[in-house]
């Protein structure tokens, strides 16, 4: 049904160490011509080398992209770099990094991941996500602009959209701005 609706990819995920449990699901998705993006949740459960080994198994079973998930938001920038570096040395598919802001380090972790070769940085508008949130998209864009990257993304239009459309829509639905700041 997803393929009939023009879905181009589906994201699968499991806790680090449980990747083999999704091989069959990935194969079924691929049979329908849909790309598989895989989330290595709670990546810190394994060493960088063990996670890279799991990513290689996923790649061998047709996964098109893997994302290292700092699910608890407790990694440090050096950890982010080590995980990305280990995966980039082991697989040919794109490697992403997803970080939470529980320690206030999402920007530092994202920069470290990017410096060590991450192809994709997950982020959320206004940092929206569970717990203390994710790397805010607007911050990611600003940081990339400082490096001369992602210049096709208009930061000011993004900020205008958030201010004029997203925040009012959220408040209309009862989502208060202070909840955004404290992660309720």
Q: Predicted segment positions?
A:
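Catalytic cores and adjacent flexible loops of soluble metabolic enzymes
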Residues: 1-184
């Amino acid at each position: 049904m997803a393929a009939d609706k023009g879905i181009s990819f589906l994201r699968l995920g499991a806790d680090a160490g449980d990747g083999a449990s999704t091989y069959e699901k990935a194969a079924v998705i691929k049979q329908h011509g849909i790309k598989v993006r895989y989330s290595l949740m709670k990546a810190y459960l394994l060493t960088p080398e063990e996670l890279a080994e799991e990513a290689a198994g996923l790649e061998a079973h047709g996964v098109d992209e893997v994302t290292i998930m700092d699910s608890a938001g407790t990694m440090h920038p050096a950890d982010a770099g080590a995980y990305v570096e280990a995966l980039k040395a082991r697989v040919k598919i794109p490697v992403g990094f997803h970080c939470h802001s529980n320690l206030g380090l999402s920007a530092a972790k994202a920069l470290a991941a990017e410096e060590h070769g991450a192809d994709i940085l997950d982020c959320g508008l206004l940092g929206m996500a569970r717990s203390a949130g994710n790397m805010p998209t607007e911050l990611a864009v600003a940081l990339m602009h400082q490096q001369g990257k992602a210049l096709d993304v208009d930061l000011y239009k993004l900020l205008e959209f958030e201010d004029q459309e997203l925040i009012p829509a959220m408040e209309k639905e009862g989502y208060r701005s202070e909840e955004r700041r404290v992660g309720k």
